[in-house]
Amino acid sequence: MDHLRDSLLSSLPRDSPSIGAMDYARRDRESTRQSVARGDFEELRQAAFYNRTWVVTSRFCDIGAGVDSVEVHVHSLWYIYYELSRHISSQSPEHEGLVLDILRIQGMGPLNRPARGNSGVDIARTVDGTLWTDLPFLVGDMTSFWIEHGATMSGTHRLNLATFLAKLASARVAKDRMCQIALLLFRNVFETSLELRTGDESDGEDLNRGMRQLEVFHLLPAAVAWLKIAAHNLALLSEVCWSDCPSHISQGGEDFLESELGRRSPAGFSPWRYMFWMKRLHEIQGQAKEAGEKTLEELAADGIEYMSNTIQSRNSEIIRAFKSADSALHQDPHLSCLRNLAGFDDDEPEESQEIARES
């Protein structure tokens, strides 16, 4: 059934891009990379926000071009923001400005023009939504960039990009679909067996590094950035078991699927998957402490705090799901933070707590 569901979530079938369009995209991306290498960040940002949006608007509204012909310029727009978001420091005001740009672009739509025969209007509807209201292709492009380049880029660039994506997700752009990138990231760092850190090498750019070569220290900063910035969104999606994304993204990692929590959980976000992430953070914290990895230990502790504080403030369904679970889960030492949130007394026998829940 997954392939039928994926066909509904993916873009409609269409012809392959023309050779001319592919050549333009290749040259355009190379030009963008050269501008980034020169440090022309502000000029590039202006080109994205003003020039690219103007080209799309002018071609559709003034020239009367079909919406398919402007898609290459939309992809160009998102590629510029991808490059800027990973090169500009996530702690800078300029990085916040990139997020504001995306929200302002969303506010430009819907793009329309008078229909032929002066009867109504034509709306710029792409296979991935309406320009500019739905920010078509933004989520798909950013997901592809993360999958293709997330392993090879430096730790600084990975953190900058993850922070940008989490900020967009916290604003609920594209109807929460940006959060599918968090699923990919969390599956890699929390649901797959990774070494904590096997060497002393820095997390610099490595074009030969694949996803299978990554370790916890590569990915944990990006994951905790998501938990810090978009914690409420991730908790909300977990409460409602959100899975509005293709199955190859929503499916759990091997370690999660083999766990008791994984056997309870559907694909996508769920209360049980949220608990598993908390459990893994607690395990990582302990492993880091034992290995003397102070930075990783503190990051894991921060992640636990962000997750715990969020579901506590929401009186979340996640806490109620934990309360209703069996005693084996309640006694898991790596879920002690959930015991506290659920109001369990560590000195009280489990049988007494079970009676109290049933009464």
Swiss-Prot record:
UniProt-listed InterPro entries: OpdG, Oxopyrrolidines_Biosynth-assoc
Phenotype of the disrupted gene, per the record: Does not affect the production of oxopyrrolidines A and B.
Segments for region (Disordered): 1-32
One Pfam family it belongs to: DUF3632
Biased composition (Low complexity): 7-18
Chain's role: Part of the gene cluster that mediates the biosynthesis of oxopyrrolidines, polyketide-amino acid hybrid compounds with feature structures of tetramic acid. Does not seem to play a role in oxopyrrolidines A and B biosynthesis.
Name recorded for this polypeptide: Oxopyrrolidines biosynthesis cluster protein G
Source organism per UniProt: Penicillium oxalicum (strain 114-2 / CGMCC 5302)
